[in-house]
UniProtKB/Swiss-Prot annotation:
The active site is at 309, 366. There is a cross-link at residue 328 (Isoglutamyl lysine isopeptide (Lys-Gln) (interchain with Q-Cter in protein Pup)). Transmembrane segments: none annotated. One of its GO terms (molecular function) is citrate (Si)-synthase activity. This is Citrate synthase 1. It comes from Mycobacterium tuberculosis (strain ATCC 25618 / H37Rv). Citrate synthase is found in nearly all cells capable of oxidative metabolism. The lineage of its organism: Bacteria, Bacillati, Actinomycetota, Actinomycetes, Mycobacteriales.
C-alpha cells in the first residue's frame, strides 16, 4: 500500500480541508481522517464502521461484489483444495507458504505444546455441566495468562512467538475438554503423533479405554472447514482482538476477547440458526415455496438464515466449496439427507426469485456448514467453538500485524454526544 500526495477535499459548514488518500494494492482506497477533528472541530459518524478502515492489512483481501476471498494473495478455492489447515496457519501468520523444513518445524513445535497445565485442567471443574462451551473456551484461554506468564509481553518477539505456538496447540485441547465436560466424559491426553485435526477429533470423541481412529475423509472435511474460516479480514471478532490488543494486552487475553465477540448470534452463531431453520421447515410440513412466501411477507416475521452477508453482494466463494463437501460427507456418513434436500431446494428457490436477487441475498458460508458439523457428530452448541478453532490463526495474524506496525495506537473511537447539556445538581428532597 502506497501513501501519496493525492488528496480528497471535504467541504463542511465554515470551510474545507484536504485529506490524504491512502492507496490500496486492490480494492477501495481510504481517506485519512487523522487531522479532521483538530482542524475542523468535526468527527465522522459511521454506525457499524461500514465505511471505516481502522487498519492497513496485508493478510486477507475480499471483493464482496465479485465474490473473491484471498489469504495473502492465494484464492480460497485453491487453498481449500490443495492446502492443509496447518499450512494455512503458517501462511496467515508469517506471510508466505512454508517449505518442507519450515512446515515440519512449525508442526513439531505445535505438537510439543498440546498439553495443558495439570492445575489448569481443574479449572473446568468450576463450570456447570450444562454450561455452553463458548464461555468455557473463552475463560480458559484467558486463564492461560495466569499459567504461562513467561510469554505475555506483546513487545517481545520471542514471547509473542511462544504464545502463538501455545495457542495454536492448546486451543483444540481446550475446545475438546469443554465438550467432554458438557457430556460428563473423562479428558484424554493429546497424542502428538497425530495431526492437529486428528488430535482434536480423538480428544473430542475418543475414550481412554479404547482406541480411536478418525476417518480420513472426516479429517479432511474438518480441515477444509477450518481453512474456510481461518480469516475474513476486519470482522467483529478480529476487530475485537485488534482493539483489545491495542492496549498492549497479551495475546491470550486478546484472543479471549475475540472468542466472546464470536459467540454473538449475529457473528458466529449463524450456522446453528440455519440448521434450526431447516429443521423447522421439515417439521412444519410446509414445502419450501410456502416458506419462501412467508419470508417475503414481512408481517409473517419469518427470517431466511444463511443468506446475505455484510460484505458479499455475490455468492460467498466459501459457500460453493462447503456445498460440494456437504454432498460428499452426508453421502458417506449417512447424514440427514432430508435437510440437505431442503437446503438445496431453498437455495434454488432464492437464487431464481427476483425478491432475493434484487436484494443480493446469496448463500453464505453458514448455509451448509451446520449440516456438515452435525454429520461429523458435533452437537449444535459446539458449532461456534469449531468456528473459533478455524478463526484462531487469522486472529493471531492480525494481532501480530498490528504490533509489527510500530506506530499503532490504542483504539479509542469518538462519539456524537446526544445527552443533556450542563445542568445543576438538585438535592434528593427537592426532586
Amino acid at each position: 500500500m502506497a501513501d501519496t500526495d493525492d488528496t480528497a477535499t471535504l467541504r463542511y459548514p465554515g470551510g474545507e480541508i484536504d485529506l490524504q488518500i491512502v492507496h490500496a494494492t486492490e480494492g477501495a482506497d481510504g481517506i485519512a481522517l487523522g487531522p479532521l477533528l483538530a482542524k475542523t472541530g468535526h468527527t465522522t459518524f459511521d454506525v457499524g464502521f461500514a465505511n471505516t478502515a481502522a487498519a492497513k492489512s496485508s493478510i486477507t483481501y475480499i471483493d464482496g461484489d465479485a465474490g473473491i476471498l484471498r489469504y495473502r494473495g492465494y484464492p480460497i478455492d485453491q487453498l481449500a483444495e490443495k492446502s492443509t489447515f496447518i499450512e494455512v496457519c503458517y501462511l496467515l501468520i508469517y506471510g508466505e507458504l512454508p517449505d518442507t523444513d519450515q512446515l515440519a518445524q512449525f508442526t513439531g513445535r505445535i505438537q510439543r505444546h498440546t498439553m495443558l497445565h495439570e492445575d489448569l485442567k481443574r479449572f473446568f471443574d468450576g463450570f456447570p455441566r450444562n454450561a455452553h462451551p463458548m464461555p468455557v473456551l473463552s475463560s480458559v484461554v484467558n486463564a492461560l495468562s495466569a499459567y504461562y506468564q513467561d510469554a505475555l509481553d506483546p513487545m517481545d518477539n520471542g514471547q509473542v512467538e511462544l504464545s502463538t505456538i501455545r495457542l495454536l496447540a492448546k486451543l483444540p485441547t481446550i475446545a475438546a475438554y469443554a465438550y467432554k465436560k458438557s457430556v460428563g466424559q473423562p479428558f484424554l491426553y493429546p497424542d502428538n503423533s497425530l495431526t492437529l485435526v486428528e488430535n482434536f477429533l480423538r480428544l473430542t470423541f475418543g475414550f481412554p479405554a479404547e482406541p480411536y481412529q478418525a476417518d480420513p475423509e472426516v479429517v479432511r472435511a474438518l480441515d477444509m472447514l477450518f481453512i474456510l474460516h481461518a480469516d475474513h479480514e476486519q470482522n467483529c471478532s478480529t476487530s475485537t482482538v485488534r482493539l483489545v490488543g491495542s492496549s498492549r494486552a497479551n495475546l491470550f487475553t486478546s484472543i479471549s476477547g475475540g472468542i466472546n465477540a464470536l459467540w454473538g448470534p449475529l457473528h458466529g452463531g449463524a450456522n446453528q440458526a440455519v440448521l434450526e431453520m431447516l429443521e423447522g421447515i421439515r417439521d412444519s410440513g410446509d414445502d419450501v415455496s410456502e416458506f419462501v412466501r412467508k419470508v417475503k411477507n414481512r408481517e409473517a416475521g419469518v427470517k431466511l438464515m444463511g443468506f446475505g452477508h455484510r460484505v458479499y453482494k455475490n455468492y460467498d466463494p466459501r459457500a460453493r466449496i462447503v456445498k460440494e463437501q456437504a454432498d460428499k460427507i452426508l453421502a458417506k456418513l449417512g447424514g440427514d439427507d432430508s435437510l440437505l434436500g431442503i437446503a438445496k431446494e431453498l437455495e434454488e428457490a432464492a437464487l431464481t426469485d427476483d425478491y432475493f436477487i434484487e436484494r443480493k441475498l446469496y448463500p453464505n458460508v453458514d448455509f451448509y456448514t451446520g449440516l456438515i458439523y452435525r454429520a461429523l457428530g458435533f452437537p449444535t452448541r459446539m458449532f461456534t467453538v469449531l468456528f473459533a478453532l478455524g478463526r484462531l490463526p487469522g486472529w493471531i495474524a492480525h494481532w501480530r500485524e498490528m504490533h509489527d506496525e510500530g506506530d499503532s495506537k490504542i483504539g479509542r473511537p469518538r462519539q456524537i454526544y446526544t445527552g443533556y447539556t450542563e445542568r445543576d445538581y438538585v438535592t434528593i428532597d427537592a426532586r
